């Protein structure tokens, strides 16, 4: 009979913290019920005491979930989380792994608050009583089940299973060459006891059709509204045979470690497909659809693939590699990791430590139910291997399948460690699969399972004794550290300075490179000295301030800080190469200190040896209290979407509420803001200019043209940020940063451009497409001041008349302020009766509708680069404008 874990209400104490989840979690019946063998003849006779003991151990030590301040102002601010989790994609969405040593401390079953999390967007708020799962498609009896019906009417299975993100250990790949995925460390795996309804029972109840009638695939769809592919649900599919195979233990899970699912893990119901990658286990399950074709969700095709190493993003799109079925990932591959020694651990070498062996430990797993049969460790680069002791706490199912990780250990003589440069591990499973020696790069950074290598180095002598320091390949997320990072920095240094030679005794960087602390970099945050940190390198950007295309603010807003994530989000490869000209040194990430000032990281007791300073997780700066101005150049501010109005088929007016209703945005006229969002696991930042007046209190408006996918042949994927904004629901939070820009209109013809004053009586204003918004902002400020007599002459280009933004406002200004404001439209194609220009911006149009060049005229423009380069600049020069000094480009 299926095991039970004790009667309980769903609103429960969860590991010491009351978890109400902001919803009603109470079912209409207790979860405990026994099933006779006749009603569960396809199920295992689970050992109830075995499962109870697993759950008891998992919950024996408190791992609290709390309201993390880092979630304040996001759509997930109601979700309780463990503060120790290492965040991999900034504040939101929540993608995180446990610190590796904390994960290993709990052993076989992972406490829920420490279970890794992969979210593509906000966590849906769910109610047990209202939630339904629809079964539809190629079934005889389409049905919508409530949660109570699923629990009451079907037998349940309960068993432990290890979940692994396909991106586990991805950061190692990113250190070789950047993939399109974020930096998972080696703790993107966890194990829980799951309880749920076998999916095959539900499909049989609904009368799933045969293969001959087209029922070839079973698709699972979640509740989230996500931006991928122009807006879609998270969905994926498996074959009909897999779904109906009793040996695979595929369930619709509603309990984890004896409790209802946590919000981050899919409350109230999710898929569990043991032995598969986590990406196939849809959370917040809403629909199961039996189909003839694979799932059509964007995330089924554009995620969880291992493409050949030569395929880059452009080739993948051009040649349709995403849609080739042979590259999809389903079952996990064989993998293993060294967890002891931990990163930066110090093993002192003395008469006591050398008398006993050091125990190297780690975990291993495989997919498809294949048992890990052997783990081996080498101390000499693979010349010889030592077979490890295996610990399999799991009982196989009645088909002999193993769904969980195992643990391995090996006793090594300390003197052998002293003589080696690295420890490496590989595992084998019962299919005789093993791990490759070298990393195999792929575009998505998936399924990395090369030998896991820990480097060893001898510490500097202290009081006549020495020690061994161990170094893992990487640290998760944007945390610094790891031998791969140091070797990469060394290679880059050698490329920049060929005279430097790599040390033959250590992978550490050449000591000739100048090192700076974070506190030292922080001091350089002004126009007189602007330093930044990117990927552990320190750059002095002071001399580039005046040349930066985005103006000095773009650098000063991040001066004195580590801006790696933001730099990568908005800069091209060309810009990244240019940055190398400004590198002055490296960031100090570890250092040797006295034992009195640093905790002992060794698992072998106290010592008087030098210890490496631990790498502490960077904590988020607490939000500033409400004040008169919302924008803070040093901080992202969370703003709530309060309204969204459709102006046309692809134009939306978004209104965002500021953190305090009595705040001004604080955006000078002429400057812009960055919208920041994590999309498909990567930070995306785009510059926008609000159309609302700078004097508005409590909110700001953005007029956005949504660039949908499959509309423009040159941009088949459409606009990343605009489609993300389109997908946002009312109440969603968005991070805003600024002000940015090198142009500021200070009133009555006066401008500040890169810190220098300029004046004009007449403005030649040229805009293309959405580039009208900064022009509009300046014009709005001028016309609000009756004593500002600056003349504005606008030429505004678009593809069609329907694409003209803010036309009603522009025409009203031209009518009511005809002496100060004039506008001329140019469209590529026109309808009959069109009274303005047709084609492109030409010299003739500009001479007719713009002021002549003079000492009191300035030109300003914003639009597509080709328009500025091939129309605006050459024609202004023909008109006598000094485009170097008299043309302002937003």
UniProtKB/Swiss-Prot annotation:
Molecular function terms from GO: FAD binding; heme binding; molybdenum ion binding; molybdopterin cofactor binding; nitrate reductase (NADH) activity; nitrate reductase (NADPH) activity; sulfite oxidase activity
Binding site for FAD: 686-689, 703-708, 715, 720-722, 773
Protein's organism: Phaseolus vulgaris
Record-listed heme binding positions: 548, 571
Record has RNA-binding as a keyword: no
Annotated InterPro entries: Cbr1-like_FAD-bd_dom, Cyt_B5-like_heme/steroid-bd, Cyt_B5-like_heme/steroid_sf, Cyt_B5_heme-BS, FAD-bd_FR_type, Flavoprot_Pyr_Nucl_cyt_Rdtase, FNR_nucleotide-bd, Ig_E-set
Summary of the function given for this chain in its UniProt record: Nitrate reductase is a key enzyme involved in the first step of nitrate assimilation in plants, fungi and bacteria.
Ranges of residues in domain Cytochrome b5 heme-binding: 513-588
Residues given in the record as Mo-molybdopterin binding sites: 165
Protein name, UniProt field: Nitrate reductase [NADH] 2
Cofactor(s) essential for the protein: FAD; heme; Mo-molybdopterin
Residue ranges annotated for the FAD-binding FR-type domain, each copy included: 634-746
Cofactor binding description: Binds 1 FAD.
Family named by the database record: Belongs to the nitrate reductase family.
Gene3D superfamilies assigned: 2.60.40.650, Cytochrome b5-like heme/steroid binding domain (3.10.120.10), Nucleotide-binding domain of ferredoxin-NADP reductase (FNR) module (3.40.50.80), Oxidoreductase, molybdopterin-binding domain (3.90.420.10), Translation factors (2.40.30.10)
Subunit structure: Homodimer.
SMART domains: Cyt-b5
Entry keywords, A to Z: Disulfide bond, FAD, Flavoprotein, Heme, Iron, Metal-binding, Molybdenum, NAD, Nitrate assimilation, Oxidoreductase
EC number: 1.7.1.1
GO term, biological process aspect, one: nitric oxide biosynthetic process
Short name of one Pfam family: Cyt-b5
Lineage: Eukaryota, Viridiplantae, Streptophyta, Embryophyta, Tracheophyta
Reactions performed catalytically: nitrite + NAD(+) + H2O = nitrate + NADH + H(+)
């Amino acid at each position: 009979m299926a095991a039970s874990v004790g009667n309980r209400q769903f609103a429960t104490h969860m590991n010491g913290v009351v978890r109400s989840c902001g919803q009603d979690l109470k079912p209409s019946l207790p979860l405990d019920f026994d099933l006779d063998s006749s009603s569960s003849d396809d199920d295992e006779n689970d050992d109830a005491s075995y499962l109870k003991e697993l759950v008891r151990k998992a919950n024996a030590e408190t791992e609290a979930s709390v309201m993390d301040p880092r979630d304040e102002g996001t759509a997930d601010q109601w979700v309780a989380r463990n503060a120790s989790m290492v965040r991999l994609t900034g504040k939101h969405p929540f993608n995180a792994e446990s610190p590796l040593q904390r994960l290993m401390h709990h052993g076989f079953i992972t406490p829920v608050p420490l279970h890794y999390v992969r979210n593509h967007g906000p966590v849906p708020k769910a109610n047990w009583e209202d939630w339904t799962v629809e079964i539809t498609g190629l079934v005889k009896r389409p049905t919508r089940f409530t949660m109570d019906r699923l629990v009451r009417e079907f037998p349940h299975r309960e068993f432990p299973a290890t979940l692994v993100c396909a991106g586990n250990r991805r950061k190692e790949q990113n250190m070789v060459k950047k993939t399109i995925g974020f930096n998972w460390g080696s703790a993107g795996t966890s194990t829980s006891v799951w309880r749920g309804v076998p999916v095959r029972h539900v499909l049989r109840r609904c009368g799933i059709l045969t293969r001959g009638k087209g029922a070839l695939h079973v698709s699972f769809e979640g509740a989230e509204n996500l931006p991928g592919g122009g807006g879609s649900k998270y969905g994926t599919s498996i074959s009909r045979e897999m779904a109906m195979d009793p040996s695979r233990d595929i369930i619709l899970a509603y309990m984890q470690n004896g409790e209802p699912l946590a919000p981050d893990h899919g409350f109230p119901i999710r898929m569990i497909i043991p032995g598969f990658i986590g990406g196939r286990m849809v959370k917040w399950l809403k629909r199961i659809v039996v189909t003839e074709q694979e799932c059509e969700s964007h995330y089924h095709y554009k995620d969880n693939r291992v493409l050949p190493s030569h395929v880059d993003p452009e080739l993948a799109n051009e040649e349709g590699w995403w849609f080739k079925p042979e590259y999809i990932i389903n079952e996990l591959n064989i993998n293993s990791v060294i967890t002891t020694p931990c990163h930066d651990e110090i093993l002192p070498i003395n008469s006591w430590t050398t008398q006993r062996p050091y125990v190297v430990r780690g975990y291993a797993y495989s997919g498809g139910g294949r048992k890990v049969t052997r783990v081996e460790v080498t101390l000499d680069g693979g010349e010889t291997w030592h077979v490890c002791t295996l610990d399999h706490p799991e009982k196989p199912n009645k088909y002999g399948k193993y769904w969980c990780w195992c643990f391995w250990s090996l006793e090594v003589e300390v003197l052998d460690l002293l003589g080696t440069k690295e420890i490496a591990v590989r595992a084998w499973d019962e299919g005789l699969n093993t791990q490759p020696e070298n990393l195999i790069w792929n575009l998505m950074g998936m399924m990395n399972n090369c030998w896991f290598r820990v480097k060893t180095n001898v510490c500097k002598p202290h009081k006549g004794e020495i020690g061994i320091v161990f170094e893992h390949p990487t640290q998760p997320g944007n945390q610094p550290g790891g031998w791969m990072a140091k070797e990469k920095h060394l290679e880059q240094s050698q490329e920049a300075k060929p005279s430097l030679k790599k040390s033959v005794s250590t992978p550490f960087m050449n000591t000739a490179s100048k090192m700076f602390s974070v506190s030292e970099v922080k001091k350089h945050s002004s126009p007189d000295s602007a330093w930044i940190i990117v990927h552990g390198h320190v750059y002095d950007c002071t001399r580039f301030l005046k040349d930066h295309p985005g103006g000095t603010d773009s650098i000063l807003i991040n001066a004195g800080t580590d801006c790696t994530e933001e730099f990568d989000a908005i800069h091209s490869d060309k810009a990244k190469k240019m940055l190398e000209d400004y590198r002055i040194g490296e960031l100090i990430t570890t250092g040797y200190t006295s034992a009195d000032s640093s905790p002992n990281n060794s698992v072998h007791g106290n010592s008087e040896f030098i210890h490496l300073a631990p790498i502490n997780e960077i904590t988020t700066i607490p939000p500033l209290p409400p004040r008169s101005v919302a924008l803070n150049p040093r901080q992202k501010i969370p703003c709530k979407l309060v309204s969204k109005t459709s102006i046309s088929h692809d134009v939306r007016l978004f209104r965002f509420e500021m953190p305090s209703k009595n705040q001004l945005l604080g955006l000078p006229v002429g400057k812009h803001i960055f919208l920041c969002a994590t999309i498909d696991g990567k930070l995306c930042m785009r510059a926008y200019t609000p159309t609302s007046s700078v004097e508005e209190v409590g909110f700001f408006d953005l007029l956005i043209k949504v660039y949908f996918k499959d509309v423009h042949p040159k941009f088949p994927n459409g606009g990343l940020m605009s489609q993300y904004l389109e997908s946002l629901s009312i109440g969603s939070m968005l991070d805003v940063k600024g002000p940015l820009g090198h142009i500021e209109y200070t009133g009555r013809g006066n401008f500040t451009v890169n810190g220098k004053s300029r004046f004009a009586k007449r403005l030649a204003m040229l805009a293309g497409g959405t580039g009208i918004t900064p022009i509009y902002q300046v014009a709005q400020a001028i016309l609000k001041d009756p004593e500002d007599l600056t003349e504005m002459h606008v030429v505004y280009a678009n593809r069609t008349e329907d694409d003209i933004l803010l036309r009603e406002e522009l025409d009203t200004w031209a009518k009511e302020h005809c002496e100060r404001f004039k506008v001329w439209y140019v469209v590529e194609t026109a309808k009959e009766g069109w009274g303005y220009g047709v084609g492109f911006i030409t010299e003739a149009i500009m001479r007719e509708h713009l002021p002549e060049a003079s000492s009191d005229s300035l030109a300003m423009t914003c639009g597509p680069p080709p328009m500025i380069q091939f129309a605006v600049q050459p024609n202004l020069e023909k008109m006598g404008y000094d485009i170097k000094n008299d043309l302002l480009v937003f």
